[in-house]
UniProtKB/Swiss-Prot annotation:
Enzyme nomenclature, EC number: 7.1.1.-
SS bonds (residue pairs): none
Transmembrane helix found in the keyword field: yes
Gene: nuoK
Pfam families, alphabetized: Oxidored_q2
Name of the protein in question: NADH-quinone oxidoreductase subunit K
GO CC annotation terms, alphabetical: NADH dehydrogenase complex; plasma membrane
Description of how the protein assembles with itself and partners: NDH-1 is composed of 14 different subunits. Subunits NuoA, H, J, K, L, M, N constitute the membrane sector of the complex.
Amino acid sequence: MISLSHYLVLGAILFSLSIAGIFLNRKNVIILLMSIELMLLAVNMNFVAFSHFSGDLAGQVFVFFILTVAAAEAAIGLAILTLLFRNRQTINVQDLDEMKG
């Protein structure tokens, strides 16, 4: 049987992979957004695991709120990204931090 520690270890591995994705690839905005979403999903998995093993449904309800915020964040981030690509013809972070003046 899968115990709580298995879920927590898997969540920690996913969270660590997302942190590594953020630190190792700072050039591409799409990879940064995907790493942030992976981080949120790792936290959600821990919430669901704690909720399941404690018998309380509050953690699972909280996950729905986090998923809603994550979906809105992804939609706004991709909209900003498409506007930046239309204006600057690039999605590299180092090229986007320069201001026109």
